[in-house]
Amino acid sequence: MMEDKGVKKLLLKLTLLALPFLLWPVLEAAVLPGNLFTFRVWETLSVNSMRVMSGPFYPNMYVKMEEEGELAPHTPFAEKRVVEWYTDPYGYRNRDTKTDVLLIGDSNITGAKLSQEETLAEVLERQLGKDVYSFAPATVNRFLGTRRFEENPPEVVVVSSIERRIAELPAVGATGMGAKLRDMTGTAINSSKVLTWLAVTADRISKLALYRRTLAQIDRTFGKKEYIAYQNEFFLEGEPANRDFSEEELKRIADVLEGYKHALESRGIRFVFMPIPNKENIYHQLLPSRKKPDFLPRLMAELKQRQVDVVDTQSTFENLYHNENIPLYPVDDAHWNEKAVEAAAGILAQYLQHDDSEHTRDARQLVKNQE
């Protein structure tokens, strides 16, 4: 009998001891501000484990905070910047869901370390005078598996990728079923405010933000964090980013992009590809080898040969940085900055407007021929 009481007391003490640790994640998710323990809005709003939600971020959110670059956060090298984020009902970084031109891409298209008005979608929208929708981070397969774009397709889809990720772009159909399944579950969650709140809260609990921030601080204090930095610029990969690509690799990548063109054209949608040069590419003279990569010029030449529309950002970026001394990437981050976005939007807008006028002339000529 005495032993039973002792066991019960021990269990009670253990429960009381564990209670704060069990309740804290719930308190963190349900009561505290989402950005209390994060260094960027990205970590605050990004979906962690609830991959049944329709988008990569929590829907219908607004966050304004001071954040730092991904390569040297909470260090003397960090460049602090106040940014604003809005997400739409589907969990993508947009103020609304209107879509004439749709951008598919990675975190550069989302606008990491950029404020909402500086993102490519908003800058391009102002320059084009058309509604531009940011569908990022996402893939062409996610787009093809999303019902709302079947019902209301955009006029143009621009697929963009940072140079180092181009070789990883999935072929059409590679993740088709997964994209359709997530679209179905996401639609169901979006249809209910209660389900949306439950999904977001459960996901925030799974993040364990304070725990992860504490581990990161311990690692920075006692660990041996190695930074890739040359001449006071931080890089994500350094020299390996400027590796050589074989002709076989180049053709395989071109096959994937040509597949995007055919898949979108079969739906009556124009396809344009816009690569974004690596920081290591444009800043290659800062690296020890000073080697200038040739991957993007070779890829663009191959795509033009296949009559795949491609926008050349590299030439403009090289001119801005090398001839006009305009920095195109933050010191502490691998993503492009607002000046690079402005330049890319200008090139893309000019390309799309020229393309529009050509299509209009072709259509008029076709009508005349039929008459």
Features from the language model and the residues they span:
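Extracellular glycan-modifying ectodomains
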Residues: 1-371
